[in-house]
């Protein structure tokens, strides 16, 4: 695991973000890419109920349905479970913040040709304070 330094922690608190390079091996990254490509190859009716949540939109190029987002996949796919709950992710975040963290939401956004994209918005929902006071993206 890449240990973050005290200067990394100071940089995070100053800039609001920290880029940690080479956190995962080439093998780990390739496994995640392969699984993501498998998600991308699925058709809307290929997803089971009660597991992952896949969201499709109609392409602006033609009438094809294209995958725009998948959520709730970490607990159903070992490679993503291992990423999300790894010392590399949670351990680094906990070291950075000095407190215990949990996974709140897992999501992959797909930016495909013909996709509508996302209009400017803020990811702010009322009552988030019920769940925690700090939310980080990794």
Spans of model-derived segments:
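Non-heme Fe(II)-dependent double-stranded beta-helix
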Residues: 1-14, 21-131
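Glycine- and acidic-residue-rich phosphate-binding/metal-coordinating active-site segment common to enzymes
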Residues: 132-137
């Amino acid at each position: 695991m890449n240990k973050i330094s005290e200067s990394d922690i100071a940089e995070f608190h100053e800039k609001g973000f920290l880029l940690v390079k080479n956190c995962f091996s080439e093998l780990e990254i390739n496994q995640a890419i392969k699984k993501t490509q498998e998600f991308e190859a699925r058709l809307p009716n290929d997803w089971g109920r009660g597991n992952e949540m896949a969201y499709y939109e109609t392409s602006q190029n033609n009438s094809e349905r294209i995958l725009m987002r998948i959520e709730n996949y970490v607990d159903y796919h070992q490679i993503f479970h291992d990423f999300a709950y790894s010392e590399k992710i949670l351990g680094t975040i906990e070291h950075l913040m000095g407190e215990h963290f949990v996974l709140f939401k897992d999501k992959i956004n797909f930016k495909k040709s013909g996709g509508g994209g996302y209009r400017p918005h803020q990811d702010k929902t009322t009552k988030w304070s019920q769940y925690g006071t700090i939310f980080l993206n990794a």
